[in-house]
Amino acid sequence: MVDRKSLVNEINKGCNSQSFLRCLNDKVEFVKEIREIYEQSFKMYAQEITARKMDTIAALENAFFRLDRDLSAEALMHRNARTFAVAMSGAVACVAFLENRNLYVANTGDSGAVLGSLNSDGKWIARRLTNEHNTDNVSEINRIIAEHPKQERDTIFRQERLLGQLLPTRAFGDFRYKWTAEVIQDFVCFRSSSSSSILLYPALFDVPTRNSYHRLNPSDKFLILATDGLWEFLTPSQVVGIVGEHLANKKFLEPLRLSGQNMTLGDIALQLAQRKANQRNRPLDQNSATHLLRVALGGTEYGIEHSKISHLLSLPKDVARLYRDDITITVIYFDSDNIGKLPKASSG
């Protein structure tokens, strides 16, 4: 994370928003027609946050609310097909920020974060750091019902979706469900001329985020961030167990290292024999996220079935969503030896 002083210096140098982006796989560029609009929003936001002092939790919450508010303002102030396409679309997010031993997680929607820890008995423990924002979460249902008139109580949720359409109950964008009927009538034209396309009351209000805080311990080994597509296949406990097992077996993908300096030929032979015996546990993937994806898509009670993976990945786009959702996984490993040496700064 860029600190306040560095951000001010970069702004004074005339930086743009992409100066702070790092993409691992693809080149990231804003659509030409709306690039300048986003740059204006970024500069205004950057100037405001450098003039305000906020603790970490407040900064994360403010960032979520501000992004959603800007998406709405950009569409209403700069009316064109591009800005409205963004405003009508929806996106969820799950963000983690690590500062010394302080781990902060913020999310909106149905992506999730799970912490993997190893207890004193050598067993993997899964700790959910986020709550799903969908109809599986009773508190979410109660929250939305409380925000609506009584006459909508029996119709706001249908087929386990908001208005029978939206699966996440919190998201960026999706302003068709957030703007008032007056705004929709004045600015938006749906293909359907039916009055049912316009809601009498907004179905969603803002994009409230949920934050969590955890102080890391040496027993905390990794953090998994993933979209809902993964959690539809595997539970948090299963995910942590799979990553933990992969972490233990990944050493067999590395070159053999002798365990001591004064080893005899017999010691070396024993180590080689043990390595050979454990080769059956050798994973196919060096990357834990790739391994997790392979198990999610191809796992069976008899092991990984690669034909199942091939089938799920080769489905046509128009039917793929009926069988699997898009899956994005990030696995972050912690240096257990170093965690105990870090300062125990207070949360905030």
Where are these regions (language model features)?
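PP2C/PPM-type serine/threonine phosphatase catalytic core
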Residues: 1-348
